[in-house]
A protein has these predicted regions:
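Extracellular glycan-modifying ectodomains
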Residues: 1-170
Length: 170
């Protein structure tokens, strides 16, 4: 999505929009799909993917969220969220280059809802269910682990409870 069209023509890869359509076509009928390709393409000149990592930035995730909300008929403005910056971040691509000093570090910023009614539990590495944070303070992590700010990292099992939601959608 973020690669300029003139460079994309020289990459031996299937265009993302075609790959998404092919995957969606293979899914069974009960599966409902939402493509976020167009939502992200509208913002491709912005910082929607990290330079040093394969994940999208919080701003990119917000645009994806807006794409989902549009399909569901709901909306939440970015102004409804608090923004917190956690400083410099270097991701997977940086490690893949053996720490090439030419890489510009990314900046990790997160947007989170202003609510004390959201809680999270997850299964830690020992298999124990523990309390956690949807957005954790990543200042305690090293520069290459800042992404652990989101849901306390990649866990086998996570449950998020939002007491603000009164229907069965949560």
């Amino acid at each position: 999505i973020t690669m300029p069209d003139n460079k994309l023509a020289h990459v031996n890869s299937t265009p993302q929009d075609k790959a998404i359509k092919k995957i969606f076509a293979k899914l069974e009928k009960p599966v409902q799909t939402i493509s976020l390709y167009d939502a992200l393409m509208q913002h491709r000149q912005e910082y929607v993917y990290y330079r040093t990592d394969h994940h999208w930035t919080s701003k990119g995730a917000y645009y994806g969220y807006v794409g989902i909300c549009e399909k569901l008929g709901i909306s939440h403005a970015l102004s409804e969220y608090k923004k917190k910056k956690f400083g410099s971040f270097i991701g997977t691509y940086y490690g893949d280059t053996n720490g090439d000093k030419n890489f510009r570090k990314d900046e990790l910023a997160v947007y989170y809802p202003v609510s004390d009614k959201i809680s999270m539990k997850y299964q830690n590495e020992s298999g124990k269910i523990v309390n956690g944070h949807v957005i954790a303070d990543s200042s305690k992590y090293g520069i290459s682990n800042k992404y652990l700010a989101f849901l306390e990292g990649d866990n086998a099992y996570t449950v998020i409870t939002n007491k603000n939601i009164k229907d069965s959608s949560s």
